[in-house]
Design a protein with these regions (language model features):
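Short, structured beta-strand/loop micro-motifs enriched in basic residues and often containing a Trp
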Residues: 31-40
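Short amphipathic alpha-helix segments
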Residues: 9-16, 48-50, 55, 80-98, ...
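Short glycine-/aliphatic-rich beta-strand segments at the starts of folded cytosolic domains
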Residues: 68-83, 109-111
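A common structural junction motif
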Residues: 58, 96-101, 127-136
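Structured core of small recognition/catalytic domains
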Residues: 108-154
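Extended boundary segments
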Residues: 1-21
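Short, Lys/Arg- and Gly-enriched loop/turn segments at beta-strand edges
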Residues: 59-71
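Short, surface-exposed secondary-structure edge patches
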Residues: 42-48
């Protein structure tokens, strides 16, 4: 991290199965008026994505996110490839879409999607991959999409 980049920490509640595997997550951010702008989307924390500005509360030496001050309008997804497939498979299959991808140490692929990028084609591909049983995914921030509404209705 450089001098103007800080970690903003997010508390992570666990679900009944114990997911996520940690209780907090640091996300790189830069100070801006009114809070900190996220420089990447989180791996586990929901409700925030790249570019969002969050308010924080200082505890000890750390800044802890308390709320979203400004929503950048971006959305994010986390994709888990099923073995024997891996992150390279996910990245290859989704390379044609307008998104930025990065892979975690444990093989999750995080997709960051700008508010100006076409939403439905990428969502259709994510859903297809789930239905083909090659991956599962969740949305850290869900876009407004007719594809999602139809999928939720079954």
């Amino acid at each position: 991290m450089n001098g103007s980049t800080v970690h903003v920490w997010f508390s992570l509640p666990s679900d009944e199965s114990g997911y996520p595997p940690q209780d907090r997550e640091p996300v790189d951010a830069e100070p801006v008026e009114g809070g900190f702008r996220l420089l990447r989307s989180p791996v586990y924390a929901s409700g925030v994505a790249l570019g969002d500005v969050v308010a924080t509360q200082r505890r000890g030496d750390a800044e802890w996110a308390t709320r979203v001050v400004s929503d950048a309008g971006n959305w994010c997804a986390r994709v888990v490839p099923f073995r024997p497939l891996d992150a390279a498979f996910v990245e290859s299959r989704l390379a044609a879409f307008e998104c930025t991808m990065w892979t975690t140490r444990i093989g999750l692929v995080v997709l960051e999607v700008s508010s100006s990028a076409p939403t439905d084609p990428l969502l259709e591909e994510l859903i297809s991959g789930r239905e083909e049983n090659v991956w599962d995914f969740d949305l850290g921030v869900a876009p407004d999409s007719e594809v999602l509404r139809q999928y939720a209705r079954g």
